[in-house]
Structure formats: structure tokens, C-alpha cells
Amino acid sequence: MQGAIARMCVLVAAAILNHPLLSPQENATLHDQDEELMARMREHEEMLEKEQAKLEKEFSQLTPEPENIGSEEEYSGYLWSSVVFLVFLVIEMFRMHGAHTEIAPFGDEDIYSEGGSLAPRLKALDKEVLNNFCDKCTYTSSNEIWRVREFVEGFADDLLESLRSVCDRDADMEVGDFVGIGSVFESWKVCKPLMCDLLVPFSPPDPFALQFHLWCSCSSNVPPNMQGCGKIKVSKSGGNEGCLCGSANMGEDMLCLLHNGNDVPSVERSPDDLLCTRNTSFLSKDQVMKWFQISVTKAWGRISHKYDFEVTFRNLDAAGALKVRFHSGKVVVLNMIPVVQLQDTDAYFVSHFPSGSESPPDPYWPLSFAVYERNLLKLISKRLPQNSCHLHCLQIVTFLHRKQASLTGRTALTNYHIKTVLLHLLLGKRASSWGTEHMESRLCDLLSFLHRSLQEKRLHHVMIGNSKVTELIQVPEIISRAEPVNLLRCLVLQAELHAQTLQHFNEMLKNAPALLQDYTPHWSNGLCLLGDGV
């Protein structure tokens, strides 16, 4: 009896595993596959009928035996039959899953779109409108950006030199030369007013030094929700820590046997004087921004008589957020951001983000790789075809994002996310695919990648833990070996924000044709008349 049941289980499992629908031929046509499937199904049907007749004959010949419920052999036989049958079923399920993956692979449109609706909306973007918009961007860039950069660099140099003269060289922070980052310095800025982001590095006076505690270091105690951040500890350096003349005012008639008369003893200051968080030795972003804002105000007061324009603070919560207004009405916006350089690298701990995104609480400082990103974009651009479309794609999407944000309000999506998507695409696609004739396809790729990232709530930082980047530029080893950081982690924790951001993106695509059409140049008597909206 047990043998017959086992044979029945094996027969059913074999029929499932060898079903013709589970083994399609990849290179066969649909007509050939249909005929072959029908033939195999008839063959299996005949085989099953023969086996069924054979099993019925065996069952009819069996003589009834007295039931022995306590028989250990009978239970063992049923158990083994069930185990064999379950094993075959598990194998069959895995084969069906693998067959489904091979038979019906998803295309890019299926992966990137929601219900297949993204691709048709992208096709609604007229090629002529895109080209006209890009011509306008090129015109604006070539005629304004370089003049604005030249002005900003000269003004920032003068302002920082005045700031150094205001500060006490023995007590205040030492300010270095600024570093230009962002869209203006990467030549893809499109919307007005033109905004220039400047990193202003500073360091503590002697004998103090900075120690860095990164989130990815082995001995780090940075919490998981502070990935991409670090703490900056202010410590005293040098060999004078055990000398009393450096920690107290001993009077002019006291002579230190460890130092000569030319050494000026310094009185130890409190953590607040060193811009640290209260009762700690870790540098405070709030204290730094307060110090920087006061210093910039004093510095501008010293040189304001030299200039024929007005300078005001745009945002009192963001130190160095300046607005320059000329008598003609033209406005130039500056973001002078106090930062701390990570040792001898091009990575900087920033006090705040110019985009206004939420900053982590003290004493955690977010780490910016904007200089590396600028260098990476510049290096990749040299390998692309002449008049490549990568910056035009970035300009189009950031323009649409800004215009949509003015209609529906701000969401979690920022221009930095869009630029990160572009860098991922530049690292993953051949250089020849970025020619100007491929602009529509690359624009579709960028929007599709961004849409998928928003749906999955996952967009990895392009510099952290990315082996493709280390092949092109020298990123600090501790950063290149770190685990990737998700830039959209906030969407995982906030369902309402995720829904708002997705709605913003869908509305942006819906309004894209109208927005681009409204802001394309109009030609009159051979002259390009540019609107004020860009």
C-alpha cells in the first residue's frame, strides 16, 4: 500500500516538474512553441492514463489487511512519502519562480513607471521645445554666469579679508580661502536669481586642534540615523598641556623655565569661547553660525563704503546667506557657508545646507563631498562627445522641479537628488550615449531613475561606498569602503512626506510640456527675447 502511494506522489511531482509550460524554448517562435506544447501535452496525457490504469489494477489486486494503527513501519512509510512529495513541490516552486523571471523580464518602462504611465508622459515632451529651452539655457549661461562668478569671487575675497582683520588672530577662528561649489560653478544653473555657494573653511587658533569622529569609523558612536555625519572634537595640541603658564595668568613678574620670554602665554578659554556645545568639547554648529554671522556683519561694515550696492542677510537662520541688490534692480545671491575641512581631503563638514534642508542636531556635522562631485562632473564631461546633453538634462529637470515647487510647495526632493541621479547615470552609461541626438532618451532615463528612487525610497550617495568613483578620482579610503548612504532615508520614516513627494513628481511630469513651452525663447526680428521667469 505504501509503495503505491509513494509511486503516486512521485508520478504527480514528475508530471508537474515536466509540464511543458515550464520549459519553453527561448529561441522558438510562438507558432512553433504552440505546436510543440500541444504535442508534449498529448504525450504526457497518454502516459498519465497508462500509469493510472496500472495503479488501479494494483489497487484492485491488493487484499485487505488488518489495520494496525500503532504499526511503526506504516507511520514511517506515510512520513517518507509525504517528505518526498513536499521536496518535489518545493523544487517545482523554485523552478516556476526562475522560469517566470526568465520568460517575462521587466523592461525599463515597467521598472521605472507606475502602471506603465511614465513613458507616455515623457513622450509628450516635444523635441523642438526641448531644443529651444536648451538654447535659452546656453544663452543665459554664456552671457551671465561668467560675469556673476567674476563679481562674486572678487567680492568674497574682499569680504573675507575684511573678516580676518576684524577677528582676533590669537583668540578667534582662523578663516581660509573660499571654495566655489554648486550649479553656478558647475555651469548648469538655469533659474534666476543666480545663486553662488561658497565654502569658507575655518580652523581653531593655536594650540588647539580638531579630531574627527566619522559615522563609518571603527570606533564610532554616531547613531545609525546620523549616517553621513560626524562629530568634531576640539582638543589642545602640543607639549604645553602640563605647563601652568598656558592655563592661568601668572603675572608679568613670573618667569616660566620651560618657555623663553618671546613666548606669549595663552589663558585657557571656556568651551563657549571655542564655539563648542555646552559642557562638551565638541564643536557646535549653532555657535559657529552665530560667530560667523556676527563676523560677516562687522566685516561688511568696514568695506561697505567701497561698493555701490546693498547687502542684506536673506535668512537669519543661515549664516552667510547674503543678497546683493544693485541700483538697477539686479540681484545676486550668495551662500557663504562656514565649514571644517576633513584633514587634508576635499571633504568638508558643513554647518548647514544651502538648499535649506533640515540639518542634524548638534554636535553632528553633515559631511559634504561637493568638491569631489564638481571634479567628477568635470572629469566625466571631458570624456563625453562635444555638445553633450548631460547638463541640458539636468537643467531641464531642475527647472521643472523648481517651477512645480512654486505651485505645490516644497517636498523632500531637492536639486541635489537630481544631480546625484545624473552622476549615477554618467557612471553607468557609455560616453557615446550622451550625444546631443540622444537628449530625449537620456532625459527619459534621468526621470525614470528618479521616479524609481522615489518609489523605492532609496537613492545612494554617489561618493560613499561606490567603487566606480574610486576608479576616476581619489576619494578617502574610509569613505570608499563605507556602506552606501541612502539620501532618501527620510521617506522611509515619514509616509506622508513620501506621498507628497511622489505627488509632486507626478504633477511635475504632467505640467512639464506647458512649463517648458511657456519659458522657451521667442524670436522677433532675429532677436531672442527671453522671459523673466528663468
Swiss-Prot record:
Residue intervals annotated with topology Cytoplasmic: 92-534
Xref: InterPro entries: ITPRIP-like, Mab-21_HhH/H2TH-like, MAB21L/cGLR
Signal sequence range: 1-15
Keyword list, A-Z: Cell membrane, Coiled coil, Glycoprotein, Membrane, Nucleus, Signal, Transmembrane, Transmembrane helix
Topological category with respect to the lipid bilayer: Single-pass type I membrane protein
Coiled coil (UniProt feature): 25-63
Keyword Transmembrane found: yes
Parts of the chain on the Extracellular side: 16-74
Chief place where the protein resides: membrane
Regions crossing the membrane: 75-91
Any single Gene Ontology cellular-component annotation: plasma membrane
Matching Gene3D superfamilies: 1.10.1410.40, 3.30.460.90
Location of the protein in the cell: Cell membrane; Nucleus outer membrane
Glycosylation sites: 27
Entry function: Enhances Ca(2+)-mediated inhibition of inositol 1,4,5-triphosphate receptor (ITPR) Ca(2+) release.
Similarity comment text for this entry: Belongs to the ITPRIP family.
Protein name: Inositol 1,4,5-trisphosphate receptor-interacting protein
Protein's organism: Takifugu rubripes
Taxonomic lineage from the root: Eukaryota, Metazoa, Chordata, Craniata, Vertebrata
